[in-house]
From Swiss-Prot:
Gene: DUS3
Source organism: Lodderomyces elongisporus (strain ATCC 11503 / CBS 2605 / JCM 1781 / NBRC 1676 / NRRL YB-4239) (Yeast)
Enzyme class: oxidoreductase
Family the UniProt entry places it in: Belongs to the Dus family. Dus3 subfamily.
Cofactor requirements of the protein: FMN
ZnF C3H1-type: positions: 105-130, 147-168
Subcellular location: Cytoplasm; Nucleus
Enzyme Commission designation: 1.3.1.89, 1.3.1.-
Name this polypeptide is given: tRNA-dihydrouridine(47) synthase [NAD(P)(+)]
UniProt main location, coarse: cytoplasm
Residues reported in the UniProt entry to bind FMN: P280, L281, T282, Q335, K407, H438, N487, G488, D489, A511, R512
Described function: Catalyzes the synthesis of dihydrouridine, a modified base found in the D-loop of most tRNAs. Specifically modifies U47 in cytoplasmic tRNAs. Catalyzes the synthesis of dihydrouridine in some mRNAs, thereby affecting their translation.
Region (Disordered): 1-26, 51-97, 223-258
Catalyses which reaction(s): 5,6-dihydrouridine(47) in tRNA + NAD(+) = uridine(47) in tRNA + NADH + H(+); 5,6-dihydrouridine(47) in tRNA + NADP(+) = uridine(47) in tRNA + NADPH + H(+); a 5,6-dihydrouridine in mRNA + NAD(+) = a uridine in mRNA + NADH + H(+); a 5,6-dihydrouridine in mRNA + NADP(+) = a uridine in mRNA + NADPH + H(+)
């Protein structure tokens, strides 16, 4: 459902009578109230409550990678004083998954494929096995059931390497079973897009890619930067003697930034009014998760954050991030981070020329992670408006018909909001299609609730700007407004409607709330709380598992990757406390529950904070995890009661 006209919250059927909860427990700040009959017995007098570092959802391992994608974290996670286990994040988690014991050459995975030739020239020169009998004898036992990829497409690209091989392999004829009619029928609506072609990737890696759009843009902005830097230094010296008058004059000069002497391409239009938006989420916001969210009502999804420099250099892992499922478009955005206008311009041009299914390119101006901040990326741009504006201008002029959007925070320091000033400058000096504001500062992180009053204040600025543009548009052109989206602490339909009904706010972006409760947009549509049963929630996890295998592959390596990312997903979903066992509503995103017991064993299992139980859940769909499966939870204190 897209909200065309904002409705007062009291007009919505916020919740049915069956979901009303009497407030029989005294309110304890930060503590979720559980009905007494569902409280688990504790083994000590100390009520242990797990602590989460939710900034991890934004970093997703980026705290250990520099702008070029290289590992740069030397903190090895030592034990604290008295040998006690530390709290917080497990840095440098070893997440590499192992493959088959005998590694089969890719040309052998389909016995009927005579066209593909071994890159090494044959079995005698190849480091991989060409002996199918040997490979099948050493291969792990098949997983029970039907291959999810074969079931979806009628054909499994993993061939003999598939962990569900028995479901599409004829042992008598020693041939793979293929339903080519189904494959032809399904592939048009079930495939991945935004896959960079080999020629373009090699050109980027060898610095031979034709950046004919961004090169003049970079040169112009670089010349303007040098002039402005010299002018700024001179004005700062004058300001030290002439006082505030010169400072105000300098600000006026900055506001009258000279436009580039070339025309920006006409952009595709986006409409975010009332859109159900899933925030960019690194690691957990992967393609299978986004695909799941599309089935649960999401209108707009974003890629995981990609770094502009490695994108412009053709770095393979970085180019895996813009990939999307065909069902995500239109409405799919690629988020990038950059501290340099030249890198952002090149990344934007490369995306424009090599992808066909991108609705917007979003500049991350809010990531709080220390490493990116020190490099001048993410939230560091909030304290450097001229640099941010140069980057946006460079992207906008280089991205062809793809519009540019930004995601910001209230500011860098707590109690020092700068977004109003920043947004005014961005509106005056750039042509961003949308601005998303997370209602927290970098310093604040998730220690306090998002400031929605300030989000509304900034929304009014954007609304005034749009009205001013409409008044100035005397020719009656179809001017696309700059959309304004609020973000922070949205965990229910009440939160969503409270946000979208604020003045100047076109829509609301959901982050952690959509990880913990993936059906949140179904609640928005129904305008009431949905007490999902444990079997319904398990069905969502099964769908995620199938999507994960389709994405990463049904071979040993692909299944291990699917299991690892499913565990990452479960590290958020287990935090959901069922509506039916809560003493009062609404539930707050930052509230932590005491240890509780569900209404049945499955509900208790789904709420377990023990990562071993998460692995047990994955085994329902991905088979038994091998002894060599590696998964280390992000948080050292991963259970309510150790």
């Amino acid at each position: 459902m897209t909200v065309q006209e904002k409705r007062p919250l009291d007009e919505a059927n916020v919740q049915g009578d069956e979901c009303k909860k009497p407030n029989t427990q005294p309110y304890v700040k930060g503590m979720a109230a559980i009905k007494p009959e569902y409280l688990a017995p504790i083994s000590s007098n100390v009520l242990q409550v797990v602590e989460y570092d939710d900034d991890e959802a934004e970093s997703g391992g980026r705290e250990t990678s520099d702008a070029s994608g290289n590992n740069s974290n030397n903190n090895k996670g030592k034990k604290g004083k008295n040998g006690k286990k530390g709290r917080g994040q497990n840095h440098n988690r070893d997440l590499k998954q192992k493959g088959d014991a005998v590694r089969l050459c890719m040309v052998m995975i389909d016995p009927e494929d005579d066209d593909t030739k071994c890159a090494a020239g044959g079995a005698e020169n190849c480091k991989y096995s060409h002996n199918i009998e040997e490979y099948l004898a050493a291969k792990s036992d098949d997983i029970e059931g039907t291959c999810p990829v074969y079931e979806a497409l009628g054909y499994c690209p993993s061939g003999l390497k598939c962990r569900w091989l028995h479901s599409h392999y004829n042992k008598e004829t020693k041939k793979l079973i293929k339903d080519l009619e189904k494959l032809e029928r399904e592939k048009s609506k079930n495939h991945e897009v935004n896959i960079i072609d080999r020629e373009s990737k090699v050109a980027l890696q060898r610095k031979k890619f034709n950046f004919d759009i961004s090169t003049p843009v970079i040169n112009f902005l670089e010349s303007r930067k040098q002039k402005d830097d010299g002018k700024q230094n001179k004005e700062e010296q004058e300001a030290s003697t002439d006082g505030n008058e010169k400072q105000e004059e300098r600000k006026d000069n900055e506001a009258s930034y000279v436009e580039q002497p070339f025309k920006v391409a006409e952009k595709k239009k986006i409409n975010l009014r009332g859109a159900k938006i899933v925030s960019p989420l690194t690691t957990v916001g992967n393609l299978p998760y986004r695909r799941l969210m599309k089935t649960l009502g999401a209108d707009v999804t974003y890629s995981e954050m990609a770094l502009a420099v490695p994108l412009s250099q053709g770095h393979r892992p970085e180019w895996a991030l813009p990939k999307a499922h065909v069902t995500e478009y239109p409405g799919f955005g690629v988020q990038i981070a950059s501290s340099k206008h030249w890198a952002a311009a090149k990344a934007a041009e490369a995306l424009y020329k090599t992808t066909l299914h991108v609705s917007e390119i979003n500049l991350n101006c809010g990531c709080p992670i220390d490493l990116l901040f020190k490099q001048g990326q993410g939230s560091a741009l909030l304290d450097s408006p001229p640099r941010l504006i140069r980057i946006v201008k460079a992207m906008n002029a280089s991205s062809g018909d793809i519009p540019v959007t930004i995601k910001i925070r209230t500011g860098v320091k707590e109690n020092k909001n700068t977004a109003v000033h920043l947004v005014n400058r961005v509106l005056e000096e750039t042509q961003v299609a949308a601005i998303t504001l997370h209602g927290r500062s970098r310093q604040q992180r998730y220690t306090k609730e998002a400031d929605w009053d300030y989000i509304e204040e900034v929304g009014k600025v954007v609304k005034t700007w749009n009205e001013k543009r409409e008044d100035e548009d005397k020719e009656g052109r179809d001017t696309n407004p700059t959309w304004f989206v609020g973000n922070g602490d949205v965990y229910s339909h009440e939160d969503w409607y409270n946000g979208v009904n604020r003045e100047g706010v076109d829509s609301v972006m959901v982050a952690r709330g959509a990880l913990i409760k993936p059906w949140i947009f179904e609640e928005v549509e129904a305008q009431q709380y949905l007490d999902k049963s444990s079997t319904e929630r398990l069905a969502m996890l099964e769908k995620y598992a199938k999507y994960a295998v389709e994405h990463w592959g049904s071979d040993e390596y692909g299944v291990s990757n699917a299991r690892r990312f499913m565990c990452e997903f479960l590290s958020f979903t287990h935090r959901y406390v069922p509506v039916g066992i809560l003493e009062r509503l609404p539930a707050k995103l930052n509230e932590r529950p005491p240890k509780w017991i569900g209404r049945n064993d499955l509900e208790t299992l789904l709420g377990s904070s023990d990562y071993k139980d998460w692995i047990k859940i994955t085994e329902m769909f991905l088979g038994k995890a091998g002894d060599d499966f590696l998964f280390i939870p992000k948080h050292k204190s991963n259970s309510y009661e150790n």
